[in-house]
Amino acid sequence: MECKMSFFKYRVMKRLFLFAVCAWAGLSLWASSVKGQGTACETRSEKVPAKVYMIKEISPENLMKVYEALGRKATGKVAVKLSTGEPGNNNYLDPALIKGLVQKVDGTIVECNTAYGGGRSDTEKHLKAAKDHGFTAIAPVVIMDADGEVSLPVKGGKHLKEDFVGKAYPEYDFTVVLSHFKGHPMGGFGGAIKNISIGIASSSGKAYIHSAGKTKSVKEVWGKLPPQDDFLESMAEAAKAVADHCGDRILYI
C-alpha cells in the first residue's frame, strides 16, 4: 500500500509541477505585457519573449536545472514564496523536492495568514502547520504579516489602488516563487499569479483583493464578494503591484 501511495503521489506531483511551469510561463508573458509602464527597480527596457523550460521527470536535481536555466540568480536576502498548505491537506510542495533549491539560494520560506478560519488564520497556528508539513526542517519560515502590513502601489488599477502585503515582505531583496497547481473556488485554479497576489497579501489584504477593494475586514468580506471578473482582475492587479515592486528581482518556478 505504501508503495502504491508513493507512486500515486509522484504522478500527482508530476502533473502539478508541469501545470506550475505553465503558470510561470503565463505570468512571465503577462509581466512582459505590462513592462512598458516602467518601475523604479526595472532594468530591462524592451520586451523579451518568455522561454518555457520543461522537465520530463520531477526531482530535486531537475528542479535545480530549471533554476539554472532561467539565468537569473537569487541574491541578497531571498524570500521563497510557496503555499504551506492547510492542516490535514497534502496538496503542497514536498519539502524533499524543494530543499536543495531553497538551501542553494539561502532562502527563507515566507507566507501570510489566511482571511478565513482554517488552520493558518493566525501566526501560531500557521507556523505549526508549516512545521507539521516539514517546511521548518529545511529552512527558516516567516509569516510576513505577523506584525502587520504595508502597502504597495497598484499602478493603473481598475479596482485596487494599493496592495496590502505582509509588513516583512519589503525586507527581502529577491523573491523565488514556487507554485503548484491547485483549485480555487473563485478563481477556478491557482498558480503563480495567485501565489504572489493573495499569497503575499496580509490577511486583511486578502480580504481587500477578494472583495475587489470594497473591504479589508476578514469578517465582512465573504458577504461582499464581487462579480467573478472583478475578483480576477483585482488578483491580477495585486500581482502586478508585487511584480512592479520586484522588477527583475523575482523568478517563477
What residue spans do the PLM features occupy?
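Extended, low-polarity segments enriched in aliphatic/aromatic residues
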Residues: R44-L82, E86-K99, K104-I253
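Bacterial Sec-dependent N-terminal signal peptides
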Residues: F8-G38
